Every structure is written in C-alpha cells, then in structure tokens.
Amino acid sequence: MHLLAPLALTTKPSPLTYTSKSSNALYQRRVAGKRSALKTSKLCVRAIDAAQPFDSEARQSIRAREAITLKIGIVGFGNFGQFLSKRFVADGHTVIATSRTDYCSTAVELGVQFFKDGDDFCEEHPDVVIFCTSILSLESTLEEFPFQRLRRDTLVCDVLSVKQFPKHLFVQRLPKHFDILCLHPMFGPDSGKGSWQDLPLVFDKVRIGEGDKRQERCNHLLRFFETQGCRMVEMSCEEHDRQAASSQFITHTVGRMLGTMELSETTISTKGFDSLLSLVDNTYHDSFDLYYGLFLYNENASTELARLELAFDQVKSQLFCRLHELIRTEHFGKDLET
C-alpha cells in the first residue's frame, strides 16, 4: 500500500511558502521522489511455522515422545521392585505399582503411584507389567491377578532368578494375546546400588506378537537396561538355568556358608579375604526364600549342591590324609622303615 499517496494528492503548497514557480517545481520534485521511494520499497514479513496440535508434524512429535516413554507396572513392590522403579522413574518413565503390603508412603518418595487394589492397578492400562515377586509367591500371585482388565497387547515380564519356572507359568496361565519377555538382571539392590556398567542382563523373548508397535515396545524396554550400562545377554530360559546353577546358586551357597561363620574384617585382611566379605555382603542379606527358590525351582541346583559337597569332602580328605601320614611317620617312623 502507498500510504502517502492520498496525502500527496490532497496536500497543496501553501501560498505563503511557495510563491514562485521555482519553489513550486522544487516541491513537486520532492513529492515525486517520495512516491518513487514508496514504489520501490518492499515489506518483508518473516514468521516461524510453529507446530499446532492439529498439524501432522505435531502429532508425529507427540507419538515420538510417547514411543520412548513407557508406563510400567510393578507387581511386588518389595526391595527389588523399589530398586527397579527408582531407575525407571529417573529415566523418565511412568511407574505404577501394586503389592500385598501397603507401600504407599515409600511409593510417594520414589515418584511412583501405588494401588492397593489389583483391579485399579490394571485399569491404568500399563504398557508393561513386571512381576517382581519372590519365586515362591509367583504362582499364587498369578492365580489372583486380574489379567482380563489389562489391554490385550500388554507386555508381561518377570525378573526372577530362575527362568524356566516363570516361563512355563506365563505360557500356561496368560492369555495368548499377551506378549511375554523373561528377564533376569544378574544383580540386585546391593551389587547394583551404584553403576550398572557391565552387569549382565539376561533376556528371552518368549512370545512377542507381530506388529511394529509390539516389537518397538519390547526393544525399548531392553534398550533401557542397555543405556544403563548392562551387558545384554540373549539366552533361552533353559540355558540360563543350566548356567545359573553352577554360578549364581553356588555363589549364594558359599556366601551363606561364610555368612553363617560370621566372618569379620581384621587388621591384616588380604584382598582375597576382602573379596569373601564382599561376597557375604552381596548374598547373605537376601531373603532365605530367594535362596530356597533358587534351589527348589532350578532342576540343576541339586546336582551342583552335590558337586560342591563332594569337592569339599575331597579337599578335607586331602588335608587329613596328609596329616595322618605325618602322624604315622612321627610315631611309627622306625617301624615303617624296617
């Protein structure tokens, strides 16, 4: 728009000011110059295309944020459930929990929404449900849990220290439209109280339904542990139990034996002895139900316990055989020579 055009057309030189032809010509030239400047000037308008809620870009952005944030339900809000929840919340995930014991105050401190009633818990429709119960109570918990109130595509996980047992229960008891992921973080509140760097996380994708959404959800949950520094190990539940019997069960057994001895630090403790005390700290404070579950629900544990007992007897036998030889030599040395 030429804002000065009307003004220029209606403005006439004052007879008092422009009395001569030369003055009038000068005035006309000035007006013409202003008109020319207006014709050549351009109005530049710059604007940022801000995403609106109804834009496709905005919807894609919202979906992207939702894709990396999970609503995770914890069933069994004891020490291990609280241990995992704290990390999930710190990573930006929404965590809800339910348990037979009332942990409302603890949940508030951790930023977790706690539900006393399992039905109310399921009505929140978590993306992932993780059973953090004890090994011994898993079966009874599954019998009482209202799975029918969950969404049909819910991902169900466990973090038990044995894997074949929960796998079989899930396959037998859960509706077929549920996804199943068996997990075992090979650490706990004591051994994992600091960094999770290089700590093993064993997983078995027992049943993950078709569709990008289901695959991405499962992978994103696993990616959480990976970004925390865990060493990711994909392994069948059967192979896990075979290896765990000769590693985890033996570790807990030796730790409990040493804990029963009430070992304590001395002024001349060696690094080896400090390692034994660390083993006691990482195992002896776990509940006996956990240790008993490792024995009862791993079919390989009895064999490893027998091997441990046999190895101890062999070492003790070597000691006493050498001692008996020494005693015989001292008391019957001359007779033995003849």
Feature-to-residue mapping (PLM):
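Rossmann-fold NAD(P)-binding glycine/threonine-rich loop
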Residues: 155, 159-196
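Interdomain hinge/lid region at the active-site interface
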Residues: 264-338
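Rossmann-like NAD(P)-binding element
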Residues: 5, 116-155
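N-terminal chloroplast transit peptides
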Residues: 1-49
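Hydrophobic Val/Ile/Leu positions in short beta-strands of Rossmann-like dinucleotide-binding domains
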Residues: 73-74, 131, 203
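Internal alpha-helical scaffold of NAD(P)-dependent oxidoreductase catalytic cores
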Residues: 198-284
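Short glycine-/small-residue-rich Rossmann-like dinucleotide-binding loops
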Residues: 132-135, 160-161, 206
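NAD(P)+-binding Rossmann beta1-loop-alpha1 motif at the extreme N-terminus of oxidoreductases
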Residues: 41-116, 120
